[in-house]
Amino acid sequence: MLEVTDLYGNSEPLTNHSILENNFEINTVPDLNFTVYRKYNERAFDMITEKCVITEVESKEMYRIEMFSCIGSGDTIGYNVQCLHIVKDLNNKLLTSELKGSQTIKSCMDFIVSGTKFTYEILDSFSSFDFESLGNDFALNVLLNNILVNFKAEFEVTNYHIVIRKKIGIENAFIF
């Protein structure tokens, strides 16, 4: 089941939605796509707007609505909804300064999460990396395109908590 939380903090359950499509790939922002119809969700349906939070009730994972489009008409009006994981909120932080020289992965993570709701854990050891320049971009972009690449690390996320490892999961794992 899903729950929608509007920009004012009001929440309502979303029922009778389509089969969820979740995409999880290493070092990318997970997404969630679903279809929902007004006749089954009158109160919640009117709360759906861009940037609202959709929570998967079972896993408690939170996603932010990035885009939705209207489908059907009359009694069968609905929305196709596309969401990105709440970790996308890291891109609300513009890093206007830079780190230079030899940096640990911890100093880099401190740099990108400072002043945000995000926390992190580093579960493996990593050598320092010598940066010409790290920053002057959005925090999530720096994580995905610089920190993870240069430290040869992978991440997984549970809402506002990021876990950094050398390897997430096992190779040749079968995902249902």
Task: Locate each region found by the language model.
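Surface-exposed cap/loop segments at beta↔alpha junctions
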Residues: N41-Y120
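A generic structural signal for short, solvent-exposed coil/turn residues
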Residues: E12, I26, D46, V57, ...
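Juxtamembrane "anchor/assembly" segments of surface/extracellular structural proteins
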Residues: M1-M47, L84-K88, A153
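Short beta-strand-centered interaction patches in the first periplasmic/extracellular domains
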Residues: S69-L90, D124-F176
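Ser/Thr- (and often Asn-) enriched beta-sheet segments in non-cytosolic proteins
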Residues: M1-T5, S11-P13, N33-T35, V53-T55, ...
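Solvent-exposed, flexible loop/coil residues
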Residues: S18, L94, S133
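Amphipathic, non-transmembrane alpha-helical segments in extracytoplasmic/periplasmic proteins
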Residues: E25, N33-F34, C83, S97-Y120, ...
